[in-house]
Amino acid sequence: MAKDPGRVLIFDTTLRDGEQSPGASLNLEEKLAIAQQLARLGVDIIEAGFPYASQGDFTAVQRIAEQVGGEEGPIICGLARASKADIKACGEAIAPAPKKRIHTFIATSDIHLEHKLRKTREEVIQIVPEMVHYAKSFSEDVEFSCEDAARSDPDFLYELIELAISAGAGTINIPDTVGYITPSEFGELIQGIDANVPNIDEAILSVHGHNDLGLAVANFLEAIKRGARQLECTINGIGERAGNAALEELVMALHVRRSFYNPFFGRDPESPTPLTAIRTEEITKTSRLVSNLTGMVVQPNKAIVGANAFAHESGIHQDGVLKNRLTYEIVDAKTVGLTDNRISLGKLSGRSAVRARLEELGYDLTRDDLNEAFAKFKDLADRKREITDRDLEAIVSEQVMQPDARFQLQLVQVSCGTTLKPTATVTLADQDGTEQTAVALGTGPVDAVCKALDSLAGESNELIEFSVKSVTEGIDALGEVTIRLRREGKIFSGHSADTDVVVAAAQAYVNALNRLIYFEKKNPIHPQHDLIKANL
């Protein structure tokens, strides 16, 4: 039987697999903010990135290892393909962390071996123990993954897993890389590994899954029943294609249905001991932080963290909830940190009050960043009577958590109406302060603004998404704009908030342009799609 830590270990891969969502690229400061909040949330392992991808990714993992890793904090993990160059970069990046892990992987399905790796099973059998052993020279804690395990020959999996454990892997991860498997099949796969790998008792069994068929969470819960004790998941379920298993859904399923899952851990059904180490009251805060910084909007009907998760429209439901919330709610909103508390910040509030509230929301800003956020706060407070938590979150994500800006928006003016052709005048300043102005016509004010910005940037970009939502209530509410641009197949997002949605749209477009330029310089490689060019 696989090693059992007595509870479920939560392995968060928001900063690695989650960041692979189209348009969700994060800069260094954003990654640090999310990593710090994940530590407060109580995750056991943070997969901080793929260090070999680029110098920027290496630096981000290294900084997280330095600033977030600690004796009492989470294990800091880096991803590495089964190559010495990848593993060496990963080992060096995570070195500052007192608790660290190298997560190395290789594809094991026949379709991946033939068409991606162009290697035989015999070659992979030689590679796996050698690379796990090499990873052990950098970190005592090594995890090995069989990429596309769900479509691999089980007997081949058993052989590779036994070799990896013998070489020193303490965690064996079984990924459903393309979201193909069903819960009963996944349970049988985990059970088969548990029964047919002779040394499986020396390792913890982990699972990783994608949501292409909407089954990721269900698959994981079935895997737990069959012996899996580590779940690799992301905040809000973000990730490539249809995303990953959602951390908040898994944790709350284990929390709410604890009496059902307790016996699978050898516990009494009514044992009150939590099945994870997650501080559930931090879930909503973490969800909003990730949504704000990635620009990935949470769907309103998303379980646990969606805007409608605790809303009731039906009169019958409303009546029942007013009499007793348990009639239609299985989760207390306060359990996940959702409260009706309204902060009383306004134009007379001082810097200390703003800083204190930002810290409560999970933002640990430098002095310069705090000054910038406070200036934006005062500007907004002159236009709004009351500033809410969502306003503060919008200020920080739009004003502070941005990559080094190639362009600064100086001015935006539009003229439009029933008899006027929409016209926009935009002024941008570059890094040395030189200003340029452009005028453009469009089908509407936002289209005109985007065309003017493209002319100043010197390249045309494909606008694939423009969305506006109200951050708070009232006629003076901030309008938050999200814009996604596509250039050469890559997607970059920008978001901004303002009481004037046209100004917000202009700033969001500039933020997306700056992010595009920032990541074009990094030019990171993809851990699964790019072939290994380094020598094994």
From Swiss-Prot:
Residues 408-536 are annotated as: Regulatory domain. GO terms for biological process: L-leucine biosynthetic process. Homodimer. Pathway: Amino-acid biosynthesis; L-leucine biosynthesis; L-leucine from 3-methyl-2-oxobutanoate: step 1/4. The keyword 4Fe-4S does not apply. This is 2-isopropylmalate synthase. Belongs to the alpha-IPM synthase/homocitrate synthase family. LeuA type 1 subfamily. Residues 8-273 form the Pyruvate carboxyltransferase domain. It comes from Prochlorococcus marinus (strain MIT 9211). NCBIfam families: leuA_bact (TIGR00973), PRK00915.1-3 (NF002086). Its main location: cytoplasm. Pfam families: HCS_D2, HMGL-like, LeuA_dimer. Its cofactor is Mn(2+). Keywords: Amino-acid biosynthesis, Branched-chain amino acid biosynthesis, Cytoplasm, Leucine biosynthesis, Manganese, Metal-binding, Transferase. Its EC number is 2.3.3.13. It is found in: Cytoplasm. It comes from the Bacteria. It is an enzyme of class 2 (transferase). It catalyses: 3-methyl-2-oxobutanoate + acetyl-CoA + H2O = (2S)-2-isopropylmalate + CoA + H(+). GO terms for molecular function: 2-isopropylmalate synthase activity; acetyl-CoA C-acetyltransferase activity; manganese ion binding. Catalyzes the condensation of the acetyl group of acetyl-CoA with 3-methyl-2-oxobutanoate (2-ketoisovalerate) to form 3-carboxy-3-hydroxy-4-methylpentanoate (2-isopropylmalate). GO terms for cellular component: cytoplasm. PANTHER family: 2-ISOPROPYLMALATE SYNTHASE 1, CHLOROPLASTIC-RELATED (PTHR10277:SF9), HOMOCITRATE SYNTHASE-RELATED (PTHR10277). Mn(2+) binds at D17, H208, H210, N244.
